[in-house]
Protein backbone atom coordinates (compact mmCIF):
# COMPACT_ATOMS: atom_id res chain seq x y z
CA UNK A 1 0.00 0.00 0.00
CA UNK A 2 1.25 3.48 -0.88
CA UNK A 3 0.25 6.41 1.32
CA UNK A 4 0.84 9.99 0.20
CA UNK A 5 1.22 12.31 3.20
CA UNK A 6 0.83 16.05 2.56
CA UNK A 7 1.78 17.91 5.72
CA UNK A 8 3.19 21.43 5.60
CA UNK A 9 4.81 21.16 9.05
CA UNK A 10 6.20 17.65 8.62
CA UNK A 11 4.99 16.30 11.97
CA UNK A 12 2.33 13.98 10.59
CA UNK A 13 4.63 12.52 7.95
CA UNK A 14 7.29 11.77 10.58
CA UNK A 15 4.72 9.96 12.70
CA UNK A 16 3.57 7.77 9.82
CA UNK A 17 7.10 7.03 8.61
CA UNK A 18 7.94 5.77 12.11
CA UNK A 19 4.60 4.04 12.58
CA UNK A 20 4.94 1.97 9.41
CA UNK A 21 8.71 1.46 9.57
CA UNK A 22 8.29 -2.28 10.15
CA UNK A 23 5.57 -2.77 7.55
CA UNK A 24 7.24 -3.91 4.34
CA UNK A 25 3.96 -3.64 2.44
CA UNK A 26 3.50 0.08 3.19
CA UNK A 27 5.35 2.95 1.50
CA UNK A 28 5.02 6.56 2.65
CA UNK A 29 5.22 8.96 -0.31
CA UNK A 30 6.14 12.63 -0.34
CA UNK A 31 5.24 15.22 -2.97
CA UNK A 32 6.59 18.36 -1.30
CA UNK A 33 4.62 21.52 -1.99
CA UNK A 34 4.98 21.85 -5.73
CA UNK A 35 1.95 21.28 -7.97
CA UNK A 36 3.97 19.55 -10.70
CA UNK A 37 5.60 17.21 -8.19
CA UNK A 38 2.18 16.41 -6.78
CA UNK A 39 0.79 15.48 -10.20
CA UNK A 40 3.88 13.39 -10.97
CA UNK A 41 3.42 11.40 -7.76
CA UNK A 42 -0.11 10.47 -8.84
CA UNK A 43 1.00 9.60 -12.39
CA UNK A 44 4.08 7.60 -11.45
CA UNK A 45 3.56 6.23 -7.93
CA UNK A 46 -0.20 5.52 -7.86
CA UNK A 47 -0.88 6.16 -4.15
CA UNK A 48 -3.71 4.16 -2.59
CA UNK A 49 -4.81 6.97 -0.31
CA UNK A 50 -3.92 10.54 0.64
CA UNK A 51 -3.39 11.97 4.14
CA UNK A 52 -3.77 15.74 4.52
CA UNK A 53 -3.20 17.91 7.57
CA UNK A 54 -5.66 20.71 8.37
CA UNK A 55 -2.87 23.32 8.39
CA UNK A 56 -1.94 22.28 4.85
CA UNK A 57 -5.55 22.56 3.70
CA UNK A 58 -5.68 26.11 5.04
CA UNK A 59 -2.34 27.14 3.49
CA UNK A 60 -1.65 28.73 0.09
CA UNK A 61 -0.85 25.25 -1.24
CA UNK A 62 -4.43 24.21 -0.47
CA UNK A 63 -5.76 25.64 -3.74
CA UNK A 64 -3.37 23.57 -5.85
CA UNK A 65 -4.15 20.54 -3.73
CA UNK A 66 -7.89 21.05 -4.21
CA UNK A 67 -7.47 21.15 -8.01
CA UNK A 68 -5.69 17.80 -7.95
CA UNK A 69 -8.15 16.18 -5.54
CA UNK A 70 -11.03 17.12 -7.82
CA UNK A 71 -9.48 14.88 -10.50
CA UNK A 72 -8.73 11.75 -8.47
CA UNK A 73 -10.91 9.03 -7.02
CA UNK A 74 -8.89 8.07 -3.96
CA UNK A 75 -10.02 8.22 -0.32
CA UNK A 76 -8.61 11.09 1.73
CA UNK A 77 -7.68 10.95 5.42
CA UNK A 78 -7.92 14.33 7.14
CA UNK A 79 -5.98 15.25 10.29
CA UNK A 80 -8.13 17.85 12.10
CA UNK A 81 -7.84 19.97 15.22
CA UNK A 82 -11.40 18.88 16.04
CA UNK A 83 -12.62 15.71 14.36
CA UNK A 84 -16.27 16.73 14.85
CA UNK A 85 -15.79 20.23 13.38
CA UNK A 86 -12.96 19.95 10.83
CA UNK A 87 -11.83 23.06 8.98
CA UNK A 88 -11.31 21.90 5.40
CA UNK A 89 -9.98 25.28 4.26
CA UNK A 90 -9.32 25.25 0.51
CA UNK A 91 -10.51 21.64 0.35
CA UNK A 92 -14.13 22.54 1.07
CA UNK A 93 -15.11 21.74 -2.54
CA UNK A 94 -13.54 18.29 -2.42
CA UNK A 95 -14.42 17.37 1.17
CA UNK A 96 -16.63 14.52 -0.05
CA UNK A 97 -13.36 12.66 -0.72
CA UNK A 98 -12.58 12.67 3.02
CA UNK A 99 -13.48 9.28 4.47
CA UNK A 100 -11.53 9.22 7.72
CA UNK A 101 -10.99 12.13 10.12
CA UNK A 102 -8.41 11.79 12.90
CA UNK A 103 -8.02 14.22 15.78
CA UNK A 104 -4.58 15.82 15.64
CA UNK A 105 -4.09 15.40 19.38
CA UNK A 106 -3.41 11.73 18.66
CA UNK A 107 -0.17 12.75 16.98
CA UNK A 108 0.99 14.90 19.90
CA UNK A 109 1.10 11.99 22.31
CA UNK A 110 4.35 10.42 23.36
CA UNK A 111 5.47 7.81 20.87
CA UNK A 112 4.84 4.94 23.30
CA UNK A 113 1.31 6.07 24.11
CA UNK A 114 0.49 6.73 20.47
CA UNK A 115 1.80 3.36 19.37
CA UNK A 116 0.02 1.42 22.09
CA UNK A 117 -3.38 3.11 22.15
CA UNK A 118 -4.02 4.66 18.75
CA UNK A 119 -1.60 3.35 16.16
CA UNK A 120 -3.23 -0.04 15.71
CA UNK A 121 -6.63 1.52 15.14
CA UNK A 122 -5.32 4.11 12.70
CA UNK A 123 -3.24 1.55 10.81
CA UNK A 124 -6.24 -0.75 10.50
CA UNK A 125 -8.42 2.01 9.10
CA UNK A 126 -5.74 3.18 6.66
CA UNK A 127 -5.20 -0.34 5.34
CA UNK A 128 -8.94 -0.82 4.91
CA UNK A 129 -9.14 2.40 2.93
CA UNK A 130 -6.06 1.59 0.86
CA UNK A 131 -7.44 -1.78 -0.20
CA UNK A 132 -10.70 -0.31 -1.44
CA UNK A 133 -10.49 2.85 -3.55
CA UNK A 134 -14.27 3.16 -3.75
CA UNK A 135 -14.64 6.60 -2.26
CA UNK A 136 -18.36 6.80 -2.99
CA UNK A 137 -19.00 3.69 -0.91
CA UNK A 138 -17.53 4.86 2.39
CA UNK A 139 -19.29 6.38 5.36
CA UNK A 140 -17.14 9.07 7.01
CA UNK A 141 -15.45 7.83 10.17
CA UNK A 142 -13.94 9.86 12.99
CA UNK A 143 -11.24 8.84 15.44
CA UNK A 144 -11.71 10.95 18.55
CA UNK A 145 -9.12 12.76 20.64
CA UNK A 146 -7.40 10.72 23.38
CA UNK A 147 -8.78 10.63 26.91
CA UNK A 148 -6.33 12.48 29.15
CA UNK A 149 -8.27 11.86 32.38
CA UNK A 150 -6.35 10.47 35.34
CA UNK A 151 -8.42 7.29 35.26
CA UNK A 152 -7.63 6.44 31.66
CA UNK A 153 -5.37 3.43 31.20
CA UNK A 154 -3.47 2.03 28.29
CA UNK A 155 -4.33 -1.65 28.31
CA UNK A 156 -3.97 -2.73 24.69
CA UNK A 157 -0.78 -3.37 22.78
CA UNK A 158 -0.36 -3.30 19.02
CA UNK A 159 0.79 -6.89 18.75
CA UNK A 160 -2.37 -8.39 20.23
CA UNK A 161 -4.98 -6.21 18.61
CA UNK A 162 -7.41 -7.47 16.03
CA UNK A 163 -10.41 -6.04 14.21
CA UNK A 164 -12.95 -7.02 16.86
CA UNK A 165 -10.95 -5.78 19.86
CA UNK A 166 -10.30 -2.45 18.17
CA UNK A 167 -13.92 -1.93 17.27
CA UNK A 168 -15.02 -2.72 20.85
CA UNK A 169 -12.40 -0.48 22.44
CA UNK A 170 -12.88 2.76 20.50
CA UNK A 171 -15.77 5.00 19.57
CA UNK A 172 -15.95 5.24 15.80
CA UNK A 173 -19.06 6.83 14.33
CA UNK A 174 -19.92 4.38 11.55
CA UNK A 175 -18.98 1.05 10.08
CA UNK A 176 -17.41 1.07 6.63
CA UNK A 177 -19.76 -0.31 4.01
CA UNK A 178 -17.87 -1.51 0.96
CA UNK A 179 -19.68 -1.26 -2.35
CA UNK A 180 -19.95 -4.44 -4.42
CA UNK A 181 -17.30 -5.21 -6.99
CA UNK A 182 -19.50 -4.38 -9.97
CA UNK A 183 -19.73 -6.74 -12.91
CA UNK A 184 -19.29 -5.24 -16.41
CA UNK A 185 -23.01 -5.94 -16.95
CA UNK A 186 -23.77 -2.64 -15.22
CA UNK A 187 -22.20 -0.87 -18.23
CA UNK A 188 -22.39 -3.30 -21.13
CA UNK A 189 -24.31 -6.59 -21.14
CA UNK A 190 -22.71 -9.51 -22.92
CA UNK A 191 -24.62 -10.41 -26.09
CA UNK A 192 -22.25 -12.86 -27.73
CA UNK A 193 -20.48 -12.11 -31.01
CA UNK A 194 -22.38 -9.27 -32.70
CA UNK A 195 -20.04 -8.38 -35.56
CA UNK A 196 -19.06 -11.38 -37.69
CA UNK A 197 -17.46 -9.40 -40.53
CA UNK A 198 -13.81 -10.07 -41.29
CA UNK A 199 -11.83 -6.84 -40.88
CA UNK A 200 -8.33 -5.66 -40.19
CA UNK A 201 -6.97 -6.18 -36.70
CA UNK A 202 -7.58 -3.89 -33.75
CA UNK A 203 -5.53 -4.06 -30.55
CA UNK A 204 -7.02 -3.54 -27.10
CA UNK A 205 -4.74 -3.11 -24.09
CA UNK A 206 -5.33 -2.98 -20.34
CA UNK A 207 -2.80 -1.85 -17.74
CA UNK A 208 -2.62 -0.44 -14.23
CA UNK A 209 0.21 -0.18 -11.69
CA UNK A 210 3.46 0.21 -13.62
CA UNK A 211 1.51 0.68 -16.82
CA UNK A 212 2.64 4.19 -17.71
CA UNK A 213 6.21 3.01 -18.26
CA UNK A 214 5.16 -0.37 -19.67
CA UNK A 215 3.08 1.38 -22.32
CA UNK A 216 6.09 3.44 -23.39
CA UNK A 217 8.03 0.24 -24.04
CA UNK A 218 5.05 -1.39 -25.76
CA UNK A 219 4.26 1.53 -28.07
CA UNK A 220 7.75 2.19 -29.41
CA UNK A 221 7.48 -0.62 -31.99
CA UNK A 222 4.36 0.73 -33.71
CA UNK A 223 4.35 2.85 -36.88
CA UNK A 224 1.92 4.93 -38.93
CA UNK A 225 0.65 1.83 -40.73
CA UNK A 226 0.22 -0.29 -37.59
CA UNK A 227 -3.24 -1.48 -36.50
CA UNK A 228 -5.24 0.90 -34.30
CA UNK A 229 -4.77 0.52 -30.56
CA UNK A 230 -7.20 1.25 -27.73
CA UNK A 231 -5.75 1.47 -24.21
CA UNK A 232 -7.33 1.51 -20.78
CA UNK A 233 -4.71 2.61 -18.24
CA UNK A 234 -6.04 3.02 -14.71
CA UNK A 235 -5.50 6.73 -14.15
CA UNK A 236 -7.60 9.52 -12.64
CA UNK A 237 -9.64 11.76 -14.91
CA UNK A 238 -7.81 14.98 -15.65
CA UNK A 239 -4.46 13.22 -16.09
CA UNK A 240 -5.17 11.04 -19.13
CA UNK A 241 -5.19 13.94 -21.57
CA UNK A 242 -1.71 15.12 -20.56
CA UNK A 243 -0.50 11.51 -20.48
CA UNK A 244 -1.71 10.98 -24.06
CA UNK A 245 -0.17 14.27 -25.16
CA UNK A 246 3.20 13.33 -23.67
CA UNK A 247 3.12 9.95 -25.42
CA UNK A 248 2.16 11.61 -28.70
CA UNK A 249 5.28 13.77 -28.47
CA UNK A 250 7.47 10.71 -27.91
CA UNK A 251 6.39 8.39 -30.71
CA UNK A 252 5.90 8.43 -34.48
CA UNK A 253 2.21 7.54 -34.23
CA UNK A 254 -0.90 9.54 -33.38
CA UNK A 255 -1.82 9.20 -29.70
CA UNK A 256 -4.80 10.99 -28.19
CA UNK A 257 -7.24 10.87 -25.29
CA UNK A 258 -10.50 9.21 -26.31
CA UNK A 259 -13.41 11.33 -27.48
CA UNK A 260 -16.87 9.94 -28.05
CA UNK A 261 -17.22 8.80 -31.66
CA UNK A 262 -13.51 8.59 -32.51
CA UNK A 263 -13.10 6.37 -35.59
CA UNK A 264 -10.22 3.89 -35.50
CA UNK A 265 -7.62 3.97 -38.26
CA UNK A 266 -4.08 2.64 -38.78
CA UNK A 267 -1.44 4.46 -36.75
CA UNK A 268 -3.94 5.78 -34.17
CA UNK A 269 -3.66 5.06 -30.44
CA UNK A 270 -6.58 6.02 -28.21
CA UNK A 271 -6.08 6.38 -24.44
CA UNK A 272 -9.25 5.99 -22.38
CA UNK A 273 -10.46 9.16 -20.65
CA UNK A 274 -9.92 8.65 -16.92
CA UNK A 275 -13.46 9.81 -16.12
CA UNK A 276 -15.39 7.41 -18.38
CA UNK A 277 -15.65 3.79 -19.39
CA UNK A 278 -14.57 3.15 -22.99
CA UNK A 279 -16.09 0.68 -25.45
CA UNK A 280 -15.33 -0.15 -29.06
CA UNK A 281 -18.13 -0.80 -31.58
CA UNK A 282 -18.43 -1.55 -35.31
CA UNK A 283 -20.79 -0.05 -37.87
CA UNK A 284 -20.76 0.65 -41.62
CA UNK A 285 -17.26 -0.72 -42.09
CA UNK A 286 -15.64 1.26 -39.26
CA UNK A 287 -14.62 0.63 -35.68
CA UNK A 288 -15.28 3.55 -33.36
CA UNK A 289 -15.31 4.24 -29.62
CA UNK A 290 -17.96 5.44 -27.21
CA UNK A 291 -17.48 6.98 -23.77
CA UNK A 292 -19.94 5.81 -21.12
CA UNK A 293 -20.50 7.15 -17.63
CA UNK A 294 -21.65 4.92 -14.80
CA UNK A 295 -20.44 3.08 -11.70
CA UNK A 296 -17.00 1.58 -11.20
CA UNK A 297 -16.52 -1.85 -12.74
CA UNK A 298 -13.99 -4.22 -11.16
CA UNK A 299 -13.36 -1.22 -8.85
CA UNK A 300 -12.22 0.98 -11.73
CA UNK A 301 -13.43 3.60 -14.19
CA UNK A 302 -12.36 3.22 -16.92
CA UNK A 303 -12.44 -0.56 -16.60
CA UNK A 304 -10.40 -2.96 -18.70
CA UNK A 305 -13.23 -5.48 -18.44
CA UNK A 306 -15.64 -3.05 -20.09
CA UNK A 307 -13.28 -2.45 -23.03
CA UNK A 308 -12.46 -6.14 -23.43
CA UNK A 309 -16.13 -7.15 -23.37
CA UNK A 310 -16.93 -4.67 -26.13
CA UNK A 311 -14.01 -6.04 -28.16
CA UNK A 312 -15.29 -9.59 -27.65
CA UNK A 313 -18.72 -8.58 -28.94
CA UNK A 314 -17.84 -6.21 -31.78
CA UNK A 315 -14.43 -7.42 -32.98
CA UNK A 316 -14.21 -11.12 -32.12
CA UNK A 317 -11.35 -12.75 -34.03
CA UNK A 318 -10.40 -9.36 -35.48
CA UNK A 319 -9.09 -8.30 -32.06
CA UNK A 320 -5.84 -8.88 -30.22
CA UNK A 321 -6.07 -8.43 -26.45
CA UNK A 322 -3.08 -7.48 -24.31
CA UNK A 323 -3.04 -7.32 -20.52
CA UNK A 324 -0.04 -5.64 -18.91
CA UNK A 325 1.25 -5.07 -15.40
CA UNK A 326 -1.34 -4.13 -12.81
CA UNK A 327 -2.85 -4.80 -9.42
CA UNK A 328 -6.14 -6.66 -9.03
CA UNK A 329 -8.05 -8.65 -11.63
CA UNK A 330 -9.61 -6.07 -13.94
CA UNK A 331 -9.68 -7.43 -17.49
CA UNK A 332 -9.35 -11.13 -16.75
CA UNK A 333 -12.98 -12.23 -17.10
CA UNK A 334 -13.63 -10.34 -20.31
CA UNK A 335 -10.31 -11.33 -21.85
CA UNK A 336 -11.66 -14.86 -21.57
CA UNK A 337 -14.77 -13.71 -23.46
CA UNK A 338 -12.49 -12.30 -26.15
CA UNK A 339 -10.60 -15.57 -26.44
CA UNK A 340 -13.81 -17.60 -26.68
CA UNK A 341 -14.93 -15.35 -29.54
CA UNK A 342 -11.73 -15.96 -31.49
CA UNK A 343 -9.45 -13.13 -30.36
CA UNK A 344 -5.76 -13.75 -29.75
CA UNK A 345 -4.73 -12.83 -26.20
CA UNK A 346 -1.38 -11.97 -24.61
CA UNK A 347 -0.29 -11.38 -21.01
CA UNK A 348 2.88 -9.78 -19.69
CA UNK A 349 5.03 -12.23 -17.73
CA UNK A 350 5.73 -12.06 -14.00
CA UNK A 351 9.42 -11.21 -14.35
CA UNK A 352 8.80 -7.94 -16.20
CA UNK A 353 5.59 -6.90 -14.42
CA UNK A 354 5.76 -4.28 -11.69
CA UNK A 355 2.70 -5.96 -10.17
CA UNK A 356 1.73 -9.40 -11.47
CA UNK A 357 -1.95 -9.14 -10.57
CA UNK A 358 -4.04 -8.52 -13.67
CA UNK A 359 -1.93 -10.77 -15.95
CA UNK A 360 -1.86 -13.55 -13.35
CA UNK A 361 -5.64 -13.53 -12.90
CA UNK A 362 -6.17 -13.74 -16.66
CA UNK A 363 -3.70 -16.61 -16.91
CA UNK A 364 -5.32 -18.47 -14.00
CA UNK A 365 -8.73 -18.64 -15.69
CA UNK A 366 -7.34 -19.73 -19.06
CA UNK A 367 -7.91 -16.40 -20.83
CA UNK A 368 -4.37 -16.09 -22.24
CA UNK A 369 -2.91 -17.60 -25.42
CA UNK A 370 0.64 -16.33 -24.95
CA UNK A 371 2.72 -15.11 -21.97
CA UNK A 372 5.64 -12.87 -22.93
CA UNK A 373 8.16 -10.47 -21.40
CA UNK A 374 7.19 -6.85 -21.98
CA UNK A 375 9.95 -6.21 -24.53
CA UNK A 376 8.60 -8.95 -26.85
CA UNK A 377 4.87 -8.21 -26.76
CA UNK A 378 4.65 -5.47 -29.40
CA UNK A 379 6.63 -7.40 -32.03
CA UNK A 380 4.50 -10.47 -31.38
CA UNK A 381 1.34 -8.39 -31.79
CA UNK A 382 2.58 -7.03 -35.11
CA UNK A 383 3.37 -10.53 -36.37
CA UNK A 384 -0.18 -11.62 -35.53
CA UNK A 385 -1.78 -8.56 -37.15
Swiss-Prot record:
GO molecular function, one term: protein-glutamine glutaminase activity
EC number: 3.1.1.61, 3.5.1.44
Database matches in PROSITE patterns: CHEB (PS50122)
Record field: catalytic activity: [protein]-L-glutamate 5-O-methyl ester + H2O = L-glutamyl-[protein] + methanol + H(+); L-glutaminyl-[protein] + H2O = L-glutamyl-[protein] + NH4(+)
GO CC annotations on file: cytoplasm
Keyword annotations of the record: Chemotaxis, Cytoplasm, Hydrolase, Phosphoprotein
Localization (cell): Cytoplasm
Active site (UniProt): 208, 234, 330
GO biological process, one term: chemotaxis
CDD domains: CheB_Rec (cd16432)
Cross-referenced InterPro entries: CheB-like, CheB_C, Sig_transdc_resp-reg_Me-estase
PTM: Phosphorylated by CheA. Phosphorylation of the N-terminal regulatory domain activates the methylesterase activity.
Domain of life: Bacteria
Cited Gene3D superfamilies: Methylesterase CheB, C-terminal domain
Record text about domains: Contains a C-terminal catalytic domain, and an N-terminal region which modulates catalytic activity.
Family under the similarity heading: Belongs to the CheB family.
Function comment: Involved in chemotaxis. Part of a chemotaxis signal transduction system that modulates chemotaxis in response to various stimuli. Catalyzes the demethylation of specific methylglutamate residues introduced into the chemoreceptors (methyl-accepting chemotaxis proteins or MCP) by CheR. Also mediates the irreversible deamidation of specific glutamine residues to glutamic acid.
Name listed for the protein in its UniProt record: Protein-glutamate methylesterase/protein-glutamine glutaminase
Organism: Borreliella burgdorferi (strain ATCC 35210 / DSM 4680 / CIP 102532 / B31)
Encoding gene per record: cheB
